[in-house]
Amino acid sequence: MKVLVLNCGSSSVKYQVFDMKNESVLAKGLAERIGLEGSRIVYQRGSEAKKVFEIPLPTHKKAIEEIFKLLVDKNNGVLQSLNEIDAVGHRVVHGGDKFVESVLVNDEVYSIFKGILDLAPLHNPYNLQGVDACSELMPGVPQVLVFDTSFHQTMPEEAYIYALPYEWYEKYKIRRYGFHGTSHYYVSRRVAELIGRPVEELKIISCHLGNGASITAIKNGKSIDTSMGYTPLEGLVMGTRCGDIDPAIPILLMEKENLTPKQMDEILNKKSGILGISGVSSDFRDVGEAAEKGNKRAELALKVFAYRVKKYIGAYYAILGGLDVLVFTAGVGERGPLERSLICSGLEHLGIKLDPEKNKVKGEELRISAPDSKVEVWVIPTNEELMIARETVRVVGEKIIKKVI
């Protein structure tokens, strides 16, 4: 079975084609700057070198159409025809409380999803455009929606209800949803496999630390709490997002600086976080280099970031009633020895102790905890695309039309 995985953003489409017999990647790449000057497609066949094709891409449909042409191209392709694609899996950012698991697209599912586009206005509409494009270009091929939020639908009410007037939850569904669910799901299963224990027996804290960052408490294989909220703005300090702050601060600053809601949203999402504190960059590598050269604000940014993660680890240790495994994943989690060290320093009383040599690892699966650490600490590179492909195979096989609360 061959599966195409698509991740449609506002001006990009990431794609991978899997042969699910051995879960190998036949081709992958990125269409970028859609609707802008200088649009192009990055294409990589198997383990070969990447190729770049400068192509006008006015719409997402055109981008997907050009990707399809490359996949069946005589010189560069990996397919004889598009008929070899058995199913398409779409990464979808927000399923709200309507979708508790991945679903096969039909008219009813399409209509329900179209009704919740406003939950993630910067993401969901483009996910839908990907579905529309595939429906036109490959009619009849099964399509599956895999939601970032689905894994967190097992959270108890006390974890997802905000202390706001309850009618706002009833009327607008304002509640914690959480994100990065596909990543947290993947690494929790993968680490259980590596240590040889059923995930249903484990208490896991999963730290997805990239430019966007979240942390999840996983008990018996299920998410019981997560740091992101109604939007991905809540929780940890991120590359450009502020994470948890006093809710009165935006109101105060809007009055003092005469800012509109849109301007305030822009500041909180794109000008805060590591970038806002350091004044250097949103890239942790750049901030780390600046800190090594003595930049005090860069040092402070990294300390604030690590401190926030550490607080969440302590809180989730409490609600889990202990901890078996701490997992680091995503860009910073996989490739940030400094950040991992800052986070774990001082957590020895919780049974968390790193091996300094093993902690130097970057981008590889490895247990990095010391031999006498009661809690196993692992680096697990995430693989959301593979997880989406697996979910697509499962859903198409089981013909899961919908799971609506």
From Swiss-Prot:
Its main location: cytoplasm. Mg(2+). Can also accept Mn(2+). Gene3D superfamilies: 3.30.420.40. Pathway: Metabolic intermediate biosynthesis; acetyl-CoA biosynthesis; acetyl-CoA from acetate: step 1/2. It is an enzyme of class 2 (transferase). Mg(2+) binds at residues 7, 384. The active site is at residue 148. ATP binds at residues 14, 208-212, 283-285. Disulfide bonds: none annotated. One of its GO terms (biological process) is acetate metabolic process. Its cofactor is Mg(2+); Mn(2+). InterPro entries: Ac/propionate_kinase, Aliphatic_acid_kin_short-chain, Aliphatic_acid_kinase_CS, ATPase_NBD. Substrate binds at residue 91. It is found in: Cytoplasm. It catalyses: acetate + ATP = acetyl phosphate + ADP. GO terms for molecular function: acetate kinase activity; ATP binding; magnesium ion binding. Keywords: ATP-binding, Cytoplasm, Kinase, Magnesium, Metal-binding, Nucleotide-binding, Transferase. GO terms for cellular component: cytoplasm. Its EC number is 2.7.2.1. Catalyzes the formation of acetyl phosphate from acetate and ATP. Can also catalyze the reverse reaction. Homodimer. Belongs to the acetokinase family. PANTHER family: ACETATE KINASE (PTHR21060), ACETATE KINASE-RELATED (PTHR21060:SF15). This is Acetate kinase. It comes from Dictyoglomus turgidum (strain DSM 6724 / Z-1310). The lineage of its organism: Bacteria, Pseudomonadati, Dictyoglomota, Dictyoglomia, Dictyoglomales. The gene is ackA.
